[in-house]
């Protein structure tokens, strides 16, 4: 396994996302890919509801760099395909959604379900299996309440399991509250945040900027290794 990239923490409002975490249900340390708020314009004022951090397994950097290194931050931020590759890539992801305003599980699950189903229908992949997965997703969240500072946690396995858990104090539990075995749901939850119609443009920009920097470093490290093997005259 690749070493975890050295990255900085990100402060979003009063929520600090650390540089790396070990998600519930995982044996891996993941690095902070990016973070940002989710909000809505209400009566001319931008109201912030949640702070969202997206973490990635270290293998994400070399995997994504093959196709995306050399692109500018703006090119990455504007590319639907780039974020689709992040969502569907063969590496683990972890999403931490921390409330800024109070939120009920029902409010959260209704919105996420709506976004997931809309995405599936738009690409023609909504089946009974996805309907059952959404039903379980809603069931896990329906009786939960999230005062400010509480978190909803998603560990996205590349094998297709979505581990759901909750945190009241900022700490991360070792195991999840529920595991839903459905690859499309595992991807769609993250797609709803950073995909084409993702709810956090700020998190998308943060991901693009931080991954672009890591791609540059990856390319630089490859060049240094190549020059060790075959020194290049200056």
From Swiss-Prot:
Transmembrane segments annotated in the record for this chain: none
Molecular function via GO: chalcone isomerase activity
Family annotation (InterPro entries): CFI, Chalcone_isomerase, Chalcone_isomerase_3-sand, Chalcone_isomerase_bundle_sf, Chalcone_isomerase_sf
One example of a Gene Ontology biological process annotation: flavonoid biosynthetic process
Reaction(s) the record says it catalyses: a chalcone = a flavanone
Swiss-Prot/TrEMBL keywords: Flavonoid biosynthesis, Isomerase
Pathway(s) the chain acts in: Secondary metabolite biosynthesis; flavonoid biosynthesis
EC number annotated for this UniProt entry: 5.5.1.6
Domain of life: Eukaryota
Positions marked as site (Important for catalytic activity): 108
SUPFAM superfamilies from the UniProt entry: Chalcone isomerase
Positions that bind substrate: 50, 115, 192
Biological role: Catalyzes the intramolecular cyclization of bicyclic chalcones into tricyclic (S)-flavanones. Responsible for the isomerization of 4,2',4',6'-tetrahydroxychalcone (also termed chalcone) into naringenin.
Additional information: Part of the biosynthetic pathway for all classes of flavonoids, a large class of secondary plant metabolites, many of which are brightly colored.
Family: Belongs to the chalcone isomerase family.
Protein name as catalogued: Chalcone--flavanone isomerase 2
Species in which this protein is naturally found: Vitis vinifera
Gene: CHI2
């Amino acid at each position: 396994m690749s070493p975890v990239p050295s990255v900085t923490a990100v402060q979003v409002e009063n929520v600090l996302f650390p540089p790396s975490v070990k998600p519930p249900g995982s044996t891996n340390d993941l690095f902070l890919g990016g973070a940002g708020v989710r909000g809505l314009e209400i009566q001319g004022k931008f109201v912030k509801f949640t702070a969202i951090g997206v973490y990635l397994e270290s293998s994400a950097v070399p995997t994504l760099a093959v196709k995306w290194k050399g692109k500018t931050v703006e090119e990455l931020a504007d590319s639907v395909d780039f974020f689709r590759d992040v969502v569907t890539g063969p590496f683990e992801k972890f999403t931490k959604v921390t409330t800024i305003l109070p939120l009920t599980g029902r409010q959260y699950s209704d919105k996420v379900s709506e976004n997931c189903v809309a995405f599936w229908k738009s690409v023609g992949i909504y089946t009974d299996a996805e309907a059952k997965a959404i039903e379980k997703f809603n069931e896990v969240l329906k009786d939960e309440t999230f005062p400010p500072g509480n978190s909803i946690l998603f560990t996205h396995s590349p094998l297709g399991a979505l581990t759901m858990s909750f945190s009241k104090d900022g700490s991360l539990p070792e195991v999840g509250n529920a595991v839903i075995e459905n690859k499309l749901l595992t991807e769609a939850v993250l797609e709803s945040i950073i995909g084409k119609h993702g709810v956090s443009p700020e998190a998308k920009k943060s991901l693009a900027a931080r991954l672009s920097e890591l791609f540059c470093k990856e390319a630089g490290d490859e060049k240094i290794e190549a020059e060790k093997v075959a020194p290049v005259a200056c």
